[in-house]
From Swiss-Prot:
InterPro entries: bL21-like, bL21-like_sf, Ribosomal_bL21, Ribosomal_bL21_CS. NCBIfam families: L21. This protein binds to 23S rRNA in the presence of protein L20. Belongs to the bacterial ribosomal protein bL21 family. One of its GO terms (cellular component) is cytoplasm. Keywords: Ribonucleoprotein, Ribosomal protein, RNA-binding, rRNA-binding. One of its GO terms (biological process) is translation. Part of the 50S ribosomal subunit. Contacts protein L20. This is Large ribosomal subunit protein bL21. Pfam families: Ribosomal_L21p. GO terms for molecular function: rRNA binding; structural constituent of ribosome.
Amino acid sequence: MYAVFQSGGKQHRVAPGHTVRLEKLEVATGSTVEFDQVLLIADGEKVHVGAPLVAGGKVVAEVVSHGRGEKVTIVKFRRRKHHDKKMGHRQWFTEVKITAINA
């Protein structure tokens, strides 16, 4: 059984027991989160595709941790002008473990 749900403007394909990194959620570590923007649920031969969402579909997850991702380096450079600018960015994330998928 697997599902595709939407969180933080991105779509994630998950199954029970999977651990996923999502955009930062303002929830405490150890708490339970429910995602109701489910786009698809597949259970063996049966596939429920939403238009755009599956009615009554829900993905339940437990918050494992919060953190920051790998550093991304941004370099801006102007040729012949002796000008360059270097910046870095680390995106916040929330790591969740999928506990249940309800159709």
